[in-house]
Amino acid sequence: MSVIPMFPLGSVLLPGEHLPLHIFEPRYQALVHECLKQDDPSFGVVLIARGHEAGGGDVRHDVATTAHIIGHEAIGSGRYLLECVGGERIRIDAWLPDDPYPLADVRPWHDEDSESMIDDTEFDTTWARVEDLYELIGQLEATENIASPGFPDFLGLPISAAEKIWSLAALIPMGQSDRLDILSAPNVRARKTALDDAIENVTAVVQFRLQP
């Protein structure tokens, strides 16, 4: 276990996902200042359960992701523009008093069953569901005159099933609750089930919006 700085957000950061941040609150300016002294500047990102990002007083979940700072720019008055990427999943054992930014005692949360691997062929149904979803999203774009997210590049996805799930979850426009379910799944097989459920949820929302 180790104590690390934490950044509560209104969104879930998934492993491998890129996260741009504009740091303007003084307490998080201090967090970044301290992080940049490290060889591998990083902090934890956790979803806020209740409350708001700014001002403190929020209630937070107990599963999080490390965020590695891969680029930063000081833009004056102590503010920063950061480019971060999600690292490993972590479990929060205890929250410490803010000093001045949130701190937590955390430990890595590895998959609980290394034997629960899945084969590439098990993604066939998932691919079909994603294709159906994006066809519906295209219809929604035409009827509501909105910009739809680009279709995921399946050929560009990682080879391993575990990384493929993280990448797909980051690409599909799902809600934060679904993203949290995927992050909180105990192993790869459960994570794929959570991903499939999330795709169904998004599909149901789009179908509802397409109703006359």
Regions from the language model: what does each represent?
Residues 1-212:
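N-terminal low-complexity, acidic/polar interaction/targeting segments
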